Amino acid sequence: MDADVLNVGVRFLLYIELAVLFGVPLFAGWLLRSADNVAVFESWRLTLRFIAWAAIVTAALGLSVMAVQMAGAWNAAWNRKMLLAVIGTPYGQAWLFRIAALFGVAVLLLWPLRRAPERAIAISLAGIALGSLAWGGHALALQGPARAVHLTADVLHLLAAGAWIGAIVALRGMVASAAKSRDGDDIRVAARALGGFATDGTVIVATVILSGSINGWMIVGFEGAAAAIETPYGVLLLAKLFLFSVMLWLAALNRFRLVPKLETALNEGQRDQALGHLKRSLMLEYCLAFAVLALVAVLGTLAPLPE
C-alpha cells in the first residue's frame, strides 16, 4: 500500500474518532441541559473509552506513517531515530499532546463521571486531542502571526465540527433507541434534546462557517481562488462545501419541520411516521458528516494551488 494512501486513511480514522470522542460527551455532558445528561453520558461511556484507546492506536500508526513519508522508506516506520526526528517537528510535538490527552480521557472513562467538573475535564482533554490535528494541516506552511491566526482558526474549526458531528451521533442514537423501545418518555427526551440544541447548534454552525472562511482565505486567498478551482484540492473543496450545505438544509429541516411534527404526533398518539422521518433525516446527516470528514482527510494532503 502507498504511504500517502495510508496517511489519508489514518487521518480519516483520527477525524472520526476524535470528533466523536469530543462531540458526543460535549453534547451529552454539557449541551444537553436537562436531568437526562448524566444518563446519556453514562450510556456512551464504554463506547467512548473504546474509541479513546482506538484513537491512541491510530495516532501511533500515524506517527509511523509520517516517518515513512519523511524517509521515503517503509523501514522508517519502526526506526527509533526516525521516529524521534518526527517527534521533534511541530507535528510531533502536537502528537505528544494528543497521546497524553487521549490517555487521560481513557483513564477518566474507567469510572462513571457523574459530576460536571469530572465530565468537563474529560471533554477538555478530548478537545485538546482533536485540536492538535491542526498541526497536521496547511497552517504549518506559514510563519509568524499568519501561522498563529491560521492555527487558531483551524482549532476552532475542528472543535466546532467535532461538536456538530458529536451532537448528530448522539441525537441519532437517542432517536434510534427511542424508536426501538417505542417508549413515550424516551421519545419525548429525544424530542426535547433536538429542540433544545437549536441555539447551540446555530452558534456551532456559525463558528464552522467563520473559521472555515478564514482558513480558505489564508490557504488560497481571494486572488488564488480561480486557480485553486482547477486543482484536485479545489474540486474536493467544492464537494465538501456542497455536502456541508446539504447538512445545513437537513439541520433546518429537523429543527423547523420534523421536530415540531414529532411533538404534535406525540400529543395525538401518532408518532411512528414522524419518528421514522426524523430517524432517516438524522441518518442521512450522519452519513454526510462522515463523507465530509473523508474529504477533509484528503484535502489536508493536497497542494491548494498549482505548482
List the predicted regions and their residue ranges.
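Polytopic transmembrane helical bundles with strong interfacial aromatic enrichment
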Residues: 1-307
